């Protein structure tokens, strides 16, 4: 939710942002018009309440013979106040509804859609194989790491089991991420995976992509697609202390996505699935600190990717590919040899005050006045990483070398095919 004062003062900036996102700039003018109507409705209601108060004093001072006529006038005024307050409530709800439709203001992201990102950096060189590399599923099955057939039997398409060393590899990766997060000052959390509608809406996930979210109608609850949602809701309607710097959490949770718009895409293996595990970083900070915190989250992701030894690139995501809450987003994408392309492993987003305003998460400034906090998020490890780890570290004999940083968790240097 964007600041109405910012909208009034900078309507062209918000219109340009809408165009950059590929969204309707007319929504800006619709909201400005609704905001003006709301302000007029407030003024009318305030004036009538003031008149009603003055009229009440007049009745109290009136003589007995004048009071009946004045009481009749008071009843008429009371009806007008009630009508004006109803009009004010309607006008305020209209503004709120339009505010909830308007995406965050893009800050520095390139224009365009999904394919218009800008590559900021390449790290590591894609490996040249002197044998025909296997894809992650073939490797996962031959090494006894992934069981898609039984996952499908038990739960349907896009479900799987991680078995044996596959389970240990993921647990090791996520544990390493948790260790790195706590060493960097993040408080680890295992948050709920079911949240109320107001929390899901507060994070900006109930817009155009709400079909991606699992909804439990009987309980009126949503399954999270990222622990960002529960971590953002943690301080809803609170004033938090940011005097000693940003408040930082890292959530370890299972995540659930319907993949409603992905029919036929990535149907093989665990690249695009309905359930996966993830360690997600989440930061609350003062708005002026958000850009620096965004850079730090990206550095955390780079450090973790270096530990798992995969070549990757960093992209500046285009405005048309941003989620509603993000003002800017950087993705890291790892090289997947059998696909001959880079695939997303992490995202880190600067959501400025968009989520904080929706969830009413505030801090006190140097004058003690409550202000809206900024929020940021970033992936530190997730199930999908196994794809890049397996494919980039495979050997001609079908084995996979375990990245050195993960060996203490897996208990092996090399994963051998199951005989």
From Swiss-Prot:
Reaction catalysed?
tRNA(Ser) + L-serine + ATP = L-seryl-tRNA(Ser) + AMP + diphosphate + H(+); tRNA(Sec) + L-serine + ATP = L-seryl-tRNA(Sec) + AMP + diphosphate + H(+)
Of which family is this protein a member? Belongs to the class-II aminoacyl-tRNA synthetase family. Type-1 seryl-tRNA synthetase subfamily.
E.C. number, please? 6.1.1.11
Give a short account of what the protein does.
Catalyzes the attachment of serine to tRNA(Ser). Is also able to aminoacylate tRNA(Sec) with serine, to form the misacylated tRNA L-seryl-tRNA(Sec), which will be further converted into selenocysteinyl-tRNA(Sec).
This protein's major location comes to cytoplasm
Q: Which GO terms describe its molecular function?
A: ATP binding; serine-tRNA ligase activity
Lineage of the source organism?
A: Bacteria, Bacillati, Actinomycetota, Actinomycetes, Mycobacteriales
Pfam families per the UniProt record, alphabetical? Seryl_tRNA_N, tRNA-synt_2b
Annotated source species: Corynebacterium efficiens (strain DSM 44549 / YS-314 / AJ 12310 / JCM 11189 / NBRC 100395)
Subunit-structure text? Homodimer. The tRNA molecule binds across the dimer.
Give the pathway: Aminoacyl-tRNA biosynthesis; selenocysteinyl-tRNA(Sec) biosynthesis; L-seryl-tRNA(Sec) from L-serine and tRNA(Sec): step 1/1
- Keyword match ATP-binding: yes
What is the protein name given in its UniProt record?
Answer: Serine--tRNA ligase
User: Does the UniProt entry include the keyword Flavoprotein?
Assistant: no
Cite the binding residues for L-serine: 226-228, 280, 379
In terms of InterPro entries, this protein maps to: aa-tRNA-synt_IIb, aa-tRNA-synth_II, aa-tRNA-synth_II/BPL/LPL, Ser-tRNA-ligase_type_1, Ser-tRNA-synth_1_N, SerRS_1_N_sf, SerRS_core, tRNA-bd_arm
A cellular-component GO term for this protein: cytoplasm
Q: Where does ATP bind?
A: 257-259, 273, 344-347
Domain remark text: Consists of two distinct domains, a catalytic core and a N-terminal extension that is involved in tRNA binding.
In the record, biological process GO terms are: selenocysteine biosynthetic process; seryl-tRNA aminoacylation
Keyword vocabulary terms for this entry: Aminoacyl-tRNA synthetase, ATP-binding, Cytoplasm, Ligase, Nucleotide-binding, Protein biosynthesis
Name the enzyme group at the top EC level: ligase
Q: Where in the cell is it found?
A: Cytoplasm
